[in-house]
Swiss-Prot record:
It comes from the Eukaryota. Residues 25-54 form the LRRNT domain. This is Reticulon-4 receptor-like 1. Cell surface receptor that plays a functionally redundant role in postnatal brain development and in regulating axon regeneration in the adult central nervous system. Contributes to normal axon migration across the brain midline and normal formation of the corpus callosum. Protects motoneurons against apoptosis; protection against apoptosis is probably mediated by MAG. Plays a role in inhibiting neurite outgrowth and axon regeneration via its binding to neuronal chondroitin sulfate proteoglycans. Binds heparin. The lineage of its organism: Eukaryota, Metazoa, Chordata, Craniata, Vertebrata.
Length: 445
């Protein structure tokens, strides 16, 4: 049984742990515990606000005017950081050094960022979602995704990327979604997607693709969705798509397809394909212009002899002169860098490799993160609804990470739970309550 007077000490202890006595949350921000969350979104901050608690796990700083990030701005306890739609132009290479708990990092819609150091994301062993869309990136340095074995969602859409070197994604053995649409890619080499053995969705539409190596998709045995529409492709060999044994949704429309003899292998592959595909409208020859390649007959290829197009079959090595010649037709939006260093390791021999079919990412608050962002990628796919949409519903497609539309106006629905702490601009709000409790304690004595 408690002493009669001990209730005073007990009340004071509870008060000290629960009331905001003049600090603990940055000015103009909202904070709440379990997990410790700081929301400073849309407050016109030009720099990271001071006073972010050291134990903060979730930090929301989107829709401000922050210009740079450096070491010391955040604590390694951080699990989630949303800092999209700011004015970030520079991220110090060691900004996230030691952040072994970080799982979700949204840097999207910082249109003046343009370049990243190779070591920017080094050591983020638990990172499972990385957003780099609309960042003005023209190139990605070799090794930038090295060691990110837990990464599942990578958003690189709507940048100015012209070229991706072989093995740029080789360490991403658990990646399931790769969004590269809305860039300026004009070719896909043999080793670009090497090692992506768990990739489920690959979006490459609205680039400038003219050429795809016939082994570009060699490792993508689990891919279910491939979008290649609105590019500059004229041909694509059936051998290129043959490894995609799990493919369900394919979009090839919006290209100037040559439906002559060079299209025979693609036509044969499409005849065998049992998934849903868009139309493949012919641009040439003139007599087939406007026809759907899928609907051509055997008789249309009866006079075709010899091997399929050597343009796609040969092992094509992109030389510096090749790239320079291509860039004359597609001016760069920034200096592209080719720093590829093929690793040469089979998927099973790389450190951190996990067997296909397992979701190996383990983190503390997956349900919360997924709930906050549910509905994003469904919107993405509906935005580019294929002309075969009547054959299936996007609502029954596998659950996946969403994409935000437009200006990235996602706002965190902060509802003040018990223990909410609102930063104050003057006198501590707990003082009157403290006086009342002390008076009650004296009365009880």
């Amino acid at each position: 049984m408690l002493r009669k007077g001990c209730c005073v000490e007990l009340l004071l202890l509870l008060l000290a742990g629960e009331l905001p006595l003049g600090g603990g949350c940055p000015r103009d921000c909202v904070c709440y515990p379990a997990p410790m969350t700081v929301s400073c979104q849309a407050h016109n901050f030009a720099a990271i606000p001071e006073g972010i608690p050291e134990d903060s796990e979730r930090i929301f700083l989107q829709n401000n005017r922050i210009t740079f990030l450096q070491q010391g701005h955040f604590s390694p306890a951080m699990v989630t950081l949303w800092i999209y739609s700011n004015n970030i132009t520079f991220i110090a290479p060691n900004t996230f050094e030691g952040f072994v708990h970080l799982e979700e990092l949204d840097l999207g819609d910082n249109r003046q960022l343009r370049t990243l150091a190779p070591e920017t994301f080094q050591g983020l062993v638990k990172l499972h979602a990385l957003y780099l869309y609309k960042c003005g990136l023209s190139a990605l340095p070799a090794g930038i995704f090295g060691g990110l074995h837990s990464l599942q969602y990578l958003y690189l859409q709507d940048n100015h990327i012209e070229y991706l070197q072989d093995d740029i994604f080789v360490d991403l053995v658990n990646l399931s979604h790769l969004f590269l649409h809305g860039n300026k890619l004009w070719s896909l080499g043999q080793g670009i997607f090497r090692g992506l053995v768990n990739l489920d969705r690959l979006l490459l539409h609205e680039n400038q693709l003219q050429w795809v190596h016939h082994k570009a998709f060699h490792d993508l045995h689990r891919l279910t969705t491939l979008f290649l529409f609105n590019n500059s492709l004229t041909e694509l060999q059936g051998d290129c798509l043959a490894p995609l044994v799990a493919l369900e949704f394919l979009r090839l429309n919006g290209n100037a397809w040559d439906c002559g003899c060079r299209a025979r292998s693609l036509w044969e592959w499409l005849r065998r394909f049992r998934g849903s595909s868009s139309a493949v409208p012919c641009a040439t020859p003139e007599l087939r212009q406007g026809q759907d390649l899928k609907l051509l007959r055997v008789e249309d290829f009866r006079n075709c002899t010899g091997p399929v197009s050597p343009h796609q079959i040969k092992s094509h090595t992109l030389t510096t002169s090749d790239r320079a010649a291509r860039k004359e037709h597609h001016p760069s939006h920034g200096a592209s860098r080719d720093k590829g260093h093929p690793h040469g390791h089979p998927p099973g021999s790389r450190s951190g490799y996990k067997k296909a079919g397992k979701n190996c990412t383990s983190h503390r608050n997956r349900n919360q993160i997924s709930k906050v962002s549910s509905g994003k990628e469904l919107t993405e796919l509906q935005d580019y609804a294929p002309d075969y949409q009547h054959k299936f519903s996007f609502d029954i497609m596998p659950t996946a990470r969403p994409k935000r539309k437009g200006k990235c106006a996602r706002r965190t629905p902060i509802r003040a739970p018990s223990g909410v702490q609102q930063a104050s601009s003057g006198t501590a709000l707990g003082a009157p309550l403290l006086a009342w409790i002390l008076g009650l304690a004296v009365t009880l004595r």
